[in-house]
């Protein structure tokens, strides 16, 4: 199967699965199809899916991730002041490393907004359906939403990383005002220590 055939198979499968989407016109261009597939993956709830689908999805995402480019952490240089510290800017879903961190919501099931530009959405898109299914299994066993600062670990699935650490970050519950600047400083570390 070619990459185009895989993409079309995955789109057709997901459209047939959701009756309201079944009447969706499939774009003829590659980018339009990639966006439609990503959107369908984003909105799909965590429920069982066929092994045939997962096999083709895994082949598609493996190739797609190669197309997007992979950055091997072993090719990066550490900072001069500390050989244990690396500074890199880029898309963490392309990192070949031991683990990446996913900033997620308290349900831990990924972002359900089609084409949303959050890291949770990108990680779930390029890792594949298995990630949402695994997180659903973990959260069902836990029986409650994840607390801020707690974390879960999963395989990287189709991402080049070995593992994904999923954590819920703090959520600001109040209006941010100029007074909030009192807790900041030119150095983020100093700002934290002054609280």
Place the predicted regions along the sequence by residue:
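Short, mixed-charge, low-aromatic patches
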Residues: 8-17, 77-82, 142-148, 177-181
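Long amphipathic N-terminal alpha/beta scaffold segment
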Residues: 59-99, 103
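Glycine-enriched loop-and-adjacent helix/strand subsegments that border the catalytic/binding cleft
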Residues: 99-100, 104-185
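Single conserved hydrophobic/aromatic residue that forms the stacking wall/gate
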Residues: 183-194
């Amino acid at each position: 199967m070619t990459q185009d055939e895989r993409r079309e198979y995955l789109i057709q499968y997901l459209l047939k699965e959701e009756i309201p989407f079944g009447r969706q016109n499939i774009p003829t261009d590659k980018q339009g199809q990639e966006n439609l597939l990503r959107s369908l993956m984003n909105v799909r709830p965590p429920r069982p899916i066929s092994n045939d689908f997962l096999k083709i999805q895994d082949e598609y995402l493996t190739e797609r991730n190669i197309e997007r480019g992979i950055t091997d952490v072993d090719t990066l240089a550490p900072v001069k002041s500390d050989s244990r510290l690396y500074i890199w800017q880029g898309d963490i879903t392309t990192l070949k490393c031991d683990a990446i961190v996913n900033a997620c919501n308290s349900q831990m099931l990924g972002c359900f907004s089609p084409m949303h530009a959050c890291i949770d959405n990108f990680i779930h898109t390029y890792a594949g359906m298995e990630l949402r299914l695994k997180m659903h299994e973990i959260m069902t066993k836990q029986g409650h939403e994840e607390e801020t600062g707690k974390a879960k670990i999963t395989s990287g699935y189709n991402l080049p990383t070995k593992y994904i650490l999923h954590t819920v970050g703090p959520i600001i519950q109040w209006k941010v005002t100029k007074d909030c600047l009192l807790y900041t400083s030119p150095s983020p570390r100093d700002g934290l220590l002054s609280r």
